[in-house]
């Protein structure tokens, strides 16, 4: 596989882009783990984001045929895959811009997104997944992002983004991936995750509220919110929900934070 990749680089004068997070998967065990994870959830449709040189795509197209599609932004990679492997089951497009729902005529009951997400846009792609009509996702992300998505309350990685994702999604780790599984090797390890939507509508107001409440981790909720809400009402809401007046955002679960958001929204 390494020889094939190097041959592609040479023949196409291709240099992997750090900005686009172009690290190509070469570990067959990891490829098998991804494909097995996708197959296990019995997807009605499979959308692969950034298939690269097709390490995962090759197996997915065999298993899911017309129920599979890929999106690739890089023109050289797109043409390579379209000509040699995916044959009109790939779009040359920006995954952040295109409407994922429009790719298939009918998404069915369990549409699933798959991808090795570039670090610099992984949070945007995850939010787009939350807002989309897709139900599940099998994603590879840098370990740092994985820690944020899996973070427990009171941990250093627990953030507004953690709370937002965990309120909307069930997040579980499948496996950690060494740097050596990719070419070129990234500087950090990656994590393979399974995301599944909860039956909860996305709330834009709650997203804004989380950004405010996590503004400064050292400050209490009261101090972070007092410029946007009446301090008396903040205390009233905290006490009515059984929280301490000196509570900090990282001490509360995503559900508790949403309860506080709802309480303040009704009072203010």
Curated annotation (Swiss-Prot):
Keywords: Cytoplasm, Methyltransferase, RNA-binding, rRNA processing, S-adenosyl-L-methionine, Transferase. Its main location: cytoplasm. Its EC number is 2.1.1.182. Gene3D superfamilies: Ribosomal RNA adenine dimethylase-like, domain 2, Vaccinia Virus protein VP39. It catalyses: adenosine(1518)/adenosine(1519) in 16S rRNA + 4 S-adenosyl-L-methionine = N(6)-dimethyladenosine(1518)/N(6)-dimethyladenosine(1519) in 16S rRNA + 4 S-adenosyl-L-homocysteine + 4 H(+). It is found in: Cytoplasm. The keyword Ribosomal protein does not apply. Transmembrane segments: none annotated. The keyword Iron does not apply. Specifically dimethylates two adjacent adenosines (A1518 and A1519) in the loop of a conserved hairpin near the 3'-end of 16S rRNA in the 30S particle. May play a critical role in biogenesis of 30S subunits. HAMAP family: 16SrRNA_methyltr_A (MF_00607). This is Ribosomal RNA small subunit methyltransferase A. It comes from Mycoplasmoides gallisepticum (strain R(low / passage 15 / clone 2)). The lineage of its organism: Bacteria, Bacillati, Mycoplasmatota, Mycoplasmoidales, Mycoplasmoidaceae.
């Amino acid at each position: 596989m390494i020889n094939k990749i190097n041959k592609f680089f040479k023949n196409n004068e291709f240099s992997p882009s750090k900005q686009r997070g172009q690290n190509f998967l070469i570990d067959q065990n990891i490829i098998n783990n991804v494909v097995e994870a996708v197959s296990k959830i019995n997807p009605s449709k499979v959308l692969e984001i950034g298939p690269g040189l097709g390490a995962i795509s090759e197996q997915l197209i065999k298993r899911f045929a017309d129920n599979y599609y890929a999106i690739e932004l890089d023109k050289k990679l797109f043409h390579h895959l379209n000509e040699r492997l995916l044959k009109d089951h790939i779009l040359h497009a920006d995954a952040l811009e295109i409407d994922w729902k429009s790719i298939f005529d009918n998404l069915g009951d369990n549409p699933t997104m798959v991808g090795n997400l570039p670090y610099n846009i992984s949070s945007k792609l995850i939010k787009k997944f939350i807002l989309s009509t897709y139900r599940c996702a099998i994603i590879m992300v840098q370990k740092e992002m994985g820690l944020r998505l899996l973070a427990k309350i009171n941990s250093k990685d627990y953030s507004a983004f953690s709370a937002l994702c965990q309120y909307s999604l069930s997040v579980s780790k499948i496996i950690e991936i060494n740097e050596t599984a990719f070419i070129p090797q990234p500087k950090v390890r990656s994590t393979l995750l399974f995301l599944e939507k909860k039956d909860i509508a996305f709330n834009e107001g709650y997203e804004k509220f989380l950004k405010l409440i996590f503004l400064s981790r050292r400050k209490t909720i009261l101090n972070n919110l007092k410029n946007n809400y009446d301090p008396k009402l903040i205390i009233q809401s905290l006490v009515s929900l059984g929280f301490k007046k000196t509570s900090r955002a990282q001490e509360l679960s995503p559900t508790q934070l949403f309860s506080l958001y709802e309480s303040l929204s009704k009072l203010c």
